[in-house]
C-alpha cells in the first residue's frame, strides 16, 4: 500500500525547493497526499480494514498540521501547494 520508490522520487523532484531537498513542508505534504489517495483507494475495496483506516486518519492529521504550519509561515507557498495538489481549501 505504500507508494513506490519511483513515485516518491518523482514527487520529491517536483516539489523540492532546492537540490537535495527531501524534508521541506511541500515535499512532505505531497508525499502524504499521495499516500492518503492510495489508502483511500484501498479502503474503497477493503471496507473493514480498520487498521489501515486508523493509519489514514493519522496521515490526514499529520498533513493538516503541516498545512496549518505552512499557512502560518507563508500564505503564498500554501496557496500554490494546495492548488497544485488539488486539495479543497
Curated annotation (Swiss-Prot):
Q: Which Gene3D superfamilies match?
A: 6.10.250.3130, S15/NS1, RNA-binding
| Keyword field | Ribonucleoprotein, Ribosomal protein, RNA-binding, rRNA-binding
The molecular function terms in GO held by this entry are:
rRNA binding; structural constituent of ribosome
Q: Which GO terms describe its biological process?
A: translation
Source organism, top-level taxon:
Bacteria
- Disulfides per UniProt: none
For this protein, the record's SMART domains field holds: Ribosomal_S15
Q: Which residues cross the membrane?
A: none
The coiled-coil segments of this chain are none
Any one GO cellular component localisation term in the record:
cytosolic small ribosomal subunit
Record's subunit section: Part of the 30S ribosomal subunit. Forms a bridge to the 50S subunit in the 70S ribosome, contacting the 23S rRNA.
NCBIfam families linked? S15_bact
HAMAP family on file: Ribosomal_uS15_B
Q: What role does this protein play?
A: One of the primary rRNA binding proteins, it binds directly to 16S rRNA where it helps nucleate assembly of the platform of the 30S subunit by binding and bridging several RNA helices of the 16S rRNA.
Family as reported in the entry's similarity comment:
Belongs to the universal ribosomal protein uS15 family.
Name the UniProt record assigns to this protein: Small ribosomal subunit protein uS15
Source organism (scientific name):
Lactiplantibacillus plantarum (strain ATCC BAA-793 / NCIMB 8826 / WCFS1)
Q: Which gene encodes it?
A: rpsO
